[in-house]
Amino acid sequence: MATFVIVHGAWGGGWEWRSVADALAARGHRTFTPTLTGLGERSHLLSRSIGLHTHAEDVAQLIRWERAQDVLLVGHSYGGMVTTMAASMVEEVKAMIYVDAFTPEPGQREIDLIDPKWVESMLLEPARRSGDGWLVPFPFPDDLDGFPADVAERYRTARHPLATFTDPADVDPRVRTLPTAFIHCTGKPPGEDLFAGLAREADQRGWLIEEIASGHDVQIEGPAAIAEVLHDLASRM
């Protein structure tokens, strides 16, 4: 049995990983899917003070208070920024798993890892236009057309604190000595894969590489597939 802590991406919440957690539990694994401060069912805590450190501390505190050991720490998308920093705060992480996720080095910000044209159109301009300069609405509402209605509605109404994308990651070099895997979701339209370059870098680093023929939100589009890959990685890391 492995212990997974799975951290969701921007505009999301732990709710979107529940099907994956259930599938892992059926295989005997212990799985936590926390929701980061200001998002999902914790959206009532949304404030200007929330930054990347806040979210990393959310995860570190979960690991401490649950007395979790030998944790397989999984980050999806923006969640990779969070898990990398959280792993720098605690000693209980056994291995890192990035699911179509950002993989920062010390001092890097998420906006440093995205094409500048996407930073402006996806984050900065929407925050100026409709987020009082500090909140980012969900930038891809048209991409939700194939999702279940309740899932699409949760994303469409979500807002994410901009500071989490512009704060630098405080990364202990020790984190990069941990066994690490990168799961690349390869079913995205041409020209819209923000993570293809990061997948190549992960391969060059000698990390374990897995591919799933899914869109970016594999936890919604293919929960059984991602659960199977995570289950397999648990025996290899």
Q: PLM features: residue spans?
A:
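Conserved HGGG/HGGXW glycine-rich cap/lid loop of the alpha/beta-hydrolase fold
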Residues: A2-S43, M89-E92
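Glycine-rich His-Gly loop
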Residues: V7-A10, S77, A101, C185
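Active-site loop/oxyanion-hole signature of alpha/beta-hydrolase fold enzymes
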Residues: R30, L36-V71, A87-S88, L113-D115
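Gly/Ala-rich beta-loop-alpha elbow adjacent to hydrolase catalytic centers
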Residues: V74-G79, T83
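Flexible "cap/lid" loop of the alpha/beta hydrolase fold
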Residues: M89-V93, I97-V136, A163-T164, G191-G197
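Active-site nucleophile elbow and catalytic-triad environment of alpha/beta-hydrolase enzymes
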Residues: R154-P173
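Catalytic His-Asp charge-relay segment
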Residues: T177-H184, L208
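Conserved loop-alpha-helix segment in the C-terminal half of the alpha/beta-hydrolase fold
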Residues: T186-I220, D232-L233
